[in-house]
Amino acid sequence: MRKKLNVYEMRIKVYLLENIPFQELQNALANFVDSALCQCEELISFHEENCYKFYSIGTLWPVERGMTYRKEQIYTLTVRTVDPDLARYFSEILRNHYTRKIKGLTVENRIIPRKMISE
């Protein structure tokens, strides 16, 4: 019997504390999520370990045409994982987490519906 694999999605509303050029965006988002991971002693070793993490970070939405995400604006960041414990942790910690450039406001959770692949 195969175990059902759920994909958990967190849509995080974030407020930018600084302008972020497109070239620096992924680094700023990774720093936001990684610094949240490092708030928990158990997850520090997980973060530092060289292995698959089983989560992914999207980019900010809506997309900015001017190649700079603007200070004092609210955007949506999408994080997905297959680990229910990690999803729970992200849901709790990212809602009020902040770095020098990004502040988390709210988190909306959902499980991505499974769809059969067709030809």
Report each predicted region and the residues it spans:
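RNA-interacting cores
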Residues: 1-119
